């Protein structure tokens, strides 16, 4: 038994704080290496502009692809063995892989390790499942919104810290530093997360068909998975062209990279501020209302982004967009909590993670293809159309299905 465990009832608020710290550490660890990923690919022997772009895209995307494949398996194991065990597995596994990445000698080794990183991931969806099964239902929106800010905070801090560390110590040492962050996450989880879980034998586990039939609204849950996918497609579609769009708007300035970094970061800052507050509001008025309103608000912000004339205008709109984005995934997760039981929470959240990962892969591809054929500004208009479809689709799905009453 760990020092933080005893026979007293589980304090879900303490677990939320520790899970938030774990999501922060894993978010930071994942994003620490992002600023110099193409540079590391080049250091491993890839030369030429086209080859470097291709390999950088592949090693970036393959992690999400393999995460999408592995998530349902880990979700099922979490429902059998417990969510804390999956948190420990994820943190330790990713830490070991990060060490090996720092030792990679060629691009193929690095590619395999990036795929392995995706296979062994899953800290955040399991943290979501753990908190969702412990928190009172009438506080789910606030709790999951608060938890989401952990990963966002880490993702905001990671690139800045990673760039600074790479400049100071070189590229390979950053992987070892990242591994130490993940090992720290492992020990924090080991000693301070409490879970009372009764293991379930494989024979007693619900099969896929039984999972579907046990859901209160199977079609609604599937529509929420699709909503998650589209949210990530919309978010990712802008990523490949943002720096180039900022350069086009800024003209001849020497600090384009700094301006781009600021504009890339402001949505995360806004999401940090909005997610807990809108989650709490969702607990009062219903997460479905928050979801639809945030989607419509996003459409109204994406359209003018196509017509901005200065980086400042783009930055202001992206800040407001971040405030809306901060409500989207927590609202979806809260609706998933309302429409599933604790017995299958691990699998439901892992399926949702798979759809999210697919969106992470397809979004940048969509944005790059649109910008190559129709220009940067068209990306924002097409993305607005995708989000508008998502709003109509979600509204129709939620309208046709009565949201279960929130109970304590």
Curated annotation (Swiss-Prot):
It is found in: Cell inner membrane. The keyword Transmembrane applies. The chain crosses the membrane at residues 16-36, 58-78, 92-112, 115-135, 146-166, 173-193, 224-244, 256-276, 290-310, 319-339, 378-398. The lineage of its organism: Bacteria, Pseudomonadati, Pseudomonadota, Gammaproteobacteria, Enterobacterales. One of its GO terms (cellular component) is plasma membrane. It is a multi-pass membrane protein. One of its GO terms (molecular function) is transmembrane transporter activity. One of its GO terms (biological process) is response to antibiotic. It comes from the Bacteria. PROSITE patterns: MFS. This is Multidrug resistance protein MdtG. HAMAP family: MFS_MdtG (MF_01528). It holds the Pfam family MFS_1. Confers resistance to fosfomycin and deoxycholate. Keywords: Antibiotic resistance, Cell inner membrane, Cell membrane, Membrane, Transmembrane, Transmembrane helix, Transport. Belongs to the major facilitator superfamily. DHA1 family. MdtG (TC 2.A.1.2.20) subfamily.
